[in-house]
From Swiss-Prot:
The gene is BOR5. Keywords: Anion exchange, Ion transport, Membrane, Transmembrane, Transmembrane helix, Transport. Residues 1-38, 102-126, 180-200, 260-294, 357-477, 587-683 are cytoplasmic. GO terms for cellular component: membrane. The chain crosses the membrane at residues 39-59, 81-101, 127-147, 159-179, 201-221, 239-259, 295-315, 336-356, 478-498, 566-586. InterPro entries: HCO3_transpt-like_TM_dom (IPR011531), HCO3_transpt_euk (IPR003020). This is Putative boron transporter 5. Belongs to the anion exchanger (TC 2.A.31.3) family.
C-alpha cells in the first residue's frame, strides 16, 4: 500500500483548477457535517487547540529571546489565529492545522542576526526587511502552485522526513538547554542591581527552573501514556492522555506560586510579553509603512533567504498535508495540494506585511486532528448502528434483515457529494455481514436466536470514517484568538515550563522515528538483539542484515551532523534547507548504488511497517479486535494510539520474517485466530 501520490501536469494552473473544482463540490457539505455534529465537535476542537496553542506560546518566548523582543508570543498567537481562520474558511484541506513552527523561528533568528549587523537595517527596519523576504517567498510559492510543483513531494522519502524531524528534535533540546542555562543568568538589557538579579536569587531562580523543567517533562510524558494505565476508567484515562500536558502546565504553574513569600518578585522568572493592546504590539501592524525605507539593494538581497524559506514551507506544508490525509483514514473528499500552496503564499504575504511570523502546516497537530475526528465519527456511527441492530433484534427480525438495517444506517451516515459507489461501501461492510450471517448459520435463523452481539461485533468490524468538516478547525482558531487576549493569564507561566515543554516535544517525537530506532540499535550487542525481536519492532530489523542497517544509519548520522552543523553558522545557517533538497538526489542516484534495492526499500519504506514481537491479536485500522471477545475493552482513541506513530503516521502491521508470509497484513485485514489455525479475510 503506497502513500497518495500528488498528481502533476505540464499545463500551468491545471493543478490549482483541479483542486478548486474538487473541493467546491464538497465545500457546502464541509459546513453541514460540522454543524450537524452538535456539541460533540467540541471534543476534537479543544483537543487540537491545546495541542496547537502550547507550542505557539513556547515558540513566541523563543522568538522573543532570539530577536531581542522584536517579536513575542503576541505575534505567534496572532499569526496562528489569523492563518487558521483563513485556512478553515478558504483552505483546500480543512483537516490541516496551521501554526508558527520551529523552522520559522529558526529562519527569523538568522534574518534578525543579519539585519542587526547592518547599519542600513538594524533592529528598526528588521521587520520591514523581513516583509520583503515574505513578499519574495509568496511569489515563489505562487509560481510553485501555478506550475504544479506539488508533485515533487513524491520524491521526498522517509529518509528526508525523519532527518528533518530529528533535526527539529535536537533543536528543541538545544533550546531547552539554552533556556535552562539562561535561568541562572541576567537577561540582556536588565538592571543587574535589582534584588532578583543578585547571586543568591539568580541561583535560586535557576534551581527552581531546573525543578520545574524536569518536573514538567516527567509528568507530561507520563500523562501522555495514560491510556495504557491499568487503573482508572476509560474516560478518565482518555481525558488525562488528551489533556494531560496542558493540565500539567497548569499544575506546575500553580505550584510556582507556592514558593516562600521572602522570594523577591521575579523569582521564579515568568513569561515576558507585551499585551495585544500595548503600543509596542500595535506598531507591528504598520510594518508595511516602513517597507519603503528599505534600500533597493536589500530588497533584492531578500530573494536569497526567501528562496530557502519558500522551499522549506513547500516541503513542510506538503508533508504535513500528506500525513493529515493518509489513505488509511479512508477520506472521501479530494486533496488540494496545489491550491493549498497557493493559499499559503497569500498567508505568508499577509503575515509579512503585518509584521507577523508566517504559519504553515504543523506536526503532529494535523494528523492528530484527523485522528480525533475519526474517533468522533466512529462513536456516532457505532451508537446509531448498535441502536438499530438492537431494535431489529427486539422485533425478531432475521439476521439478514438485521444486517440490511445496519447497512442502511451506515450508508446514510456516510453520505457525501463525493462518496464511494454503493458497491465499494458494501465491500467495506463485508466482514460485518459475514459475522452476522455466520452467527445465524451456527445458532439460529433470527437475530435474537443467533449469537450476534451488536455491541461486540459492530465494534470489531466498523470501518474507519473521518468526520470531514471545517467547523473544528475554525473553532480552534477562534480559541487561539481568545488566547491572544488571555495573555495576562498566560504571562503567569514560568519560562522554565516552556523550556520543559520544548524537551517534552523533542522526547515525544523520538519513538517511532526509524532513524532514532536504528541509531539505538547500533548500541545493542549481538547477544542482546533477541530482546529487540521480543517486542514490536520495525520490519527492517528482520529483513535487512545488521551490517546494511549499520551502514545506512551511519550515513544518516553523518548527514544529520552536517545539517546540524550548518545551523550553527552565523547568518549562512539559513541555507540548511538546501541539504534536504540535495538529499533527494542522493537518495535517487547514489544510495541505490551502495545498497541492494530490496534493503533500501525496507530502510526507506514509504510506510511504517511493524512486526509484532509476541503473538497477540493485532489491532486493525478498521477498529476490529477479538480482544472484546475475551472481555478486554479498549477505547477508540487507544486503538488509534497503537496504530499511529508520534508523528501521526499510520503503522502497517506485517508478519514476522520467520512466519508464514503469504501476504502482508494491511490495515483493512483481520487475522482471526481459531483453534490453532490462522486465516485472513480481506475487506
Amino acid at each position: 500500500m503506497e502513500e497518495e501520490r500528488v498528481e502533476g501536469s505540464k499545463r500551468p494552473f491545471q493543478g490549482i483548477i483541479r483542486d478548486v473544482k474538487g473541493r467546491a463540490l464538497c465545500y457546502k457539505q464541509d459546513w453541514i457535517a460540522g454543524l450537524r455534529s452538535g456539541f460533540g465537535i467540541l471534543a476534537p476542537t479543544t483537543y487540537v487547540f491545546f495541542a496547537s496553542a502550547l507550542p505557539v506560546i513556547a515558540f513566541g518566548e523563543q522568538l522573543s529571546h532570539d530577536t531581542e523582543r522584536s517579536l513575542s508570543t503576541v505575534e505567534t498567537l496572532a499569526s496562528t489565529a489569523l492563518c487558521g481562520v483563513i485556512h478553515s474558511l478558504l483552505g483546500g484541506q480543512p483537516l490541516l492545522i496551521l501554526g508558527v513552527a520551529e523552522p520559522t523561528v529558526l529562519m527569523y533568528k538568522y534574518l534578525y542576526d543579519f539585519a542587526k549587523g547592518r547599519p542600513e537595517l538594524g533592529k528598526q527596519l528588521y521587520l520591514a526587511w523581513v516583509a520583503w523576504v515574505c513578499v519574495w517567498t509568496a511569489l515563489l510559492l505562487f509560481l510553485m502552485a501555478i506550475f504544479n510543483m506539488a508533485y515533487i513531494i513524491n520524491r521526498f522519502t522517509r529518509i528526508a522526513g525523519e532527518l528533518f524531524g530529528m533535526l527539529i528534535a535536537v533543536l528543541f533540546l538545544q533550546q531547552t538547554i539554552k533556556g535552562m542555562v539562561s535561568e541562572f543568568r541576567i537577561p540582556k538589557g536588565e538592571d543587574s542591581k535589582l534584588e532578583k538579579y543578585q547571586f543568591e536569587w539568580l541561583y535560586t531562580n535557576g534551581l527552581l527552573g531546573l525543578i520545574f523543567t524536569v518536573g514538567l517533562v516527567y509528568t507530561a510524558l507520563k500523562s501522555r501514556k495514560a491510556r495504557s494505565w491499568p487503573y482508572g476508567t476509560g474516560c478518565c484515562r482518555s481525558f488525562v492522555a488528551d489533556y494531560g500536558v496542558p493540565l500539567m502546565v497548569v499544575v506546575w504553574t500553580a505550584l510556582s506560586f507556592s514558593t516562600p513569600s521572602k522570594l523577591p518578585s521575579g523569582v521564579p522568572r515568568r513569561l515576558v510579553s507585551p499585551l495585544p493592546w500595548d503600543s509596542v504590539s500595535l506598531t507591528h501592524w504598520t510594518v508595511i509603512k516602513d517597507m519603503g525605507k528599505v534600500s533597493p539593494g536589500y530588497i533584492f538581497a531578500a530573494f536569497i533567504p526567501a528562496l530557502m524559506i519558500a522551499g522549506l514551507y513547500f516541503f513542510d506544508h506538503s508533508v504535513v498535508s500528506q500525513l493529515a490525509q493518509q489513505k488509511e483514514f479512508n477520506l472521501k473528499n479530494p486533496s488540494a495540494y496545489h491550491y493549498d500552496i497557493l493559499l499559503l503564499g497569500f498567508m505568508v504575504l499577509i503575515c509579512g506585511m503585518l509584521g507577523l511570523p508566517p504559519s504553515n502546516g504543523v506536526l503532529p497537530q494535523s494528523p492528530m486532528h484527523t485522528k480525533s475526528l475519526a474517533v468522533f465519527k466512529r462513536q456516532l456511527m457505532r451508537r446509531k448502528m448498535v441502536m438499530t441492530a438492537k431494535e431489529s433484534i427486539r422485533q425478531k427480525a432475521t439476521s439478514s434483515q438485521v444486517y440490511e438495517d445496519m447497512e442502511q444506517v451506515f450508508i446514510e451516515m456516510d453520505k457525501s457529494p463525493l462518496a464511494e459507489t454503493h458497491t465499494t461501501l458494501i465491500n467495506e461492510l463485508q466482514d460485518l455481514k459475514e459475522a452476522v450471517m455466520k452467527k445465524s448459520d451456527d445458532d439460529g435463523d433470527t437475530g435474537e436466536e443467533s449469537g450476534f452481539d451488536p455491541e461486540k461485533h459492530v465494534d470489531a468490524y466498523l470501518p474507519v470514517r473521518v468526520n470531514e468538516q471545517r467547523v473544528s478547525n475554525l473553532l480552534q482558531s477562534l480559541l487561539v484568538i481568545g488566547a491572544v487576549f488571555a495573555l495576562p493569564v498566560i504571562k503567569l507561566i514560568p519560562t522554565s515550563l516552556l523550556w520543559g515543554y520544548f524537551a517534552y516535544m523533542a522526547i515525544d517525537s523520538l519513538p517511532d522515528n526509524q532513524f532514532f530506532e536504528r541509531t539505538v540499535l547500533l548500541f545493542v550487542p549481538p547477544t542482546r538483539r533477541f530482546k529487540v525481536l521480543e517486542g514490536a519492532h520495525a520490519s527492517f530489523v528482520e529483513k535487512v542484515p545488521h551490517k546494511s542497517i549499520a551502514a545506512f544509519t551511519l550515513f544518516q548520522i553523518l548527514y544529520f551532523g552536517l545539517c546540524y552543523g550548518v545551523t550553527w553558522i552565523p547568518v549562512a545557517g539559513i541555507m540548511f534547507p538546501v541539504l534536504f533538497f540535495l538529499l533527494v538526489a542522493i537518495r535517487q542516484y547514489l544510495l541505490p548504488k551502495l545498497f541492494k534495492p530490496a534493503y533500501l526499500r525496507e530502510l526507506d519504506a514509504a510506510e511504517y511497517e511493524e512486526i509484532p514481537g509476541t503473538p497477540r491479536n493485532p489491532l486493525e485500522l478498521s477498529f476490529r479486535s477479538n480482544n472484546s471477545a475475551r472481555g478486554v475493552q479498549e477505547c477508540d482513541a487507544e486503538i488509534l494510539d497503537e496504530l499511529t506513530t508520534s508523528r501521526g503516521e499510520l503503522k502497517v502491521r506485517t508478519l514476522g520474517h520467520n512466519e508464514d508470509k503469504g501476504h502482508q497484513i494491511y490495515p483493512k485485514e483481520i487475522v482471526e485466530v481459531g483453534d490453532g489455525d490462522m486465516s485472513s479475510s480481506r475487506e
